[in-house]
């Protein structure tokens, strides 16, 4: 069975990229068996959010001898930023307090930011002193291989936070390093209506944000309108709204692929049955063929 595909920067991606998420009782030991069953249904690209996912892909690639089998690894941009020589994650609570106090409307931060234990906030001078950390970022990239993961998700929650702090220059530097290592970057964020306009100048192949038929941050209608007009490719994270749309997956994909013109989706699967349901729904949709140059 051949999945419909999309082409980004000359490389093919399936329009559905499984994120293997076994139930807690099975844990990481069930990643490989479930990945293998999805592969046997036709999946040839997997979301790889952890070292155990990458290990499972390596094992499957070795045993199947399938050179076309690939994954999408994740690099957290926090690994590329430091403050006063210390990793930025040590100042996470201070960043949250800073964003909460003035960089986003209070009605939004209440719902999307974790609680902060810090009464302190960054001054503008301190924000300006957040620096790119080449050794840590290069070390993070060294765990990945462009042959296994030609595309690389980069951003995560610290990507949103750096954009909120006005430090897109750090993201530009990290994108350049990712490309220098031979990867094709895909920027991933959590706050769709905030991230897409702010991150638009980045030299990335696509943008990945949580959006589905039920919700998106900060507002589904605004996010939908923005994506419809967005000039660059968008990938849907959490396309089934935490599994609540599984039994109406064809409609969920139709909303994304037909209405919003989203190029691909990354649904989570916890069982072979879920994978089968999604494969059957996906086959109703075509590949995206780039226009022929004249």
Show the residue positions of the predicted features.
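N-terminal binding-site loop/beta-alpha segment at the start of enzyme catalytic domains
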Residues: 1-69, 255, 259
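Generic preference for well-ordered secondary structure
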Residues: 2, 30, 41, 121-128, ...
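Residue-level detector of functional hotspots within protein domains
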Residues: 2-4, 32, 123, 138, ...
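Beta/alpha (TIM)-barrel catalytic core signal, keyed to glycine-rich beta->alpha loops juxtaposed to Asp/Glu
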Residues: 17-22, 27, 51-56, 77-81, ...
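Active-site beta->alpha loop and helix N-cap motifs at the rims of alpha/beta catalytic domains
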Residues: 65-165
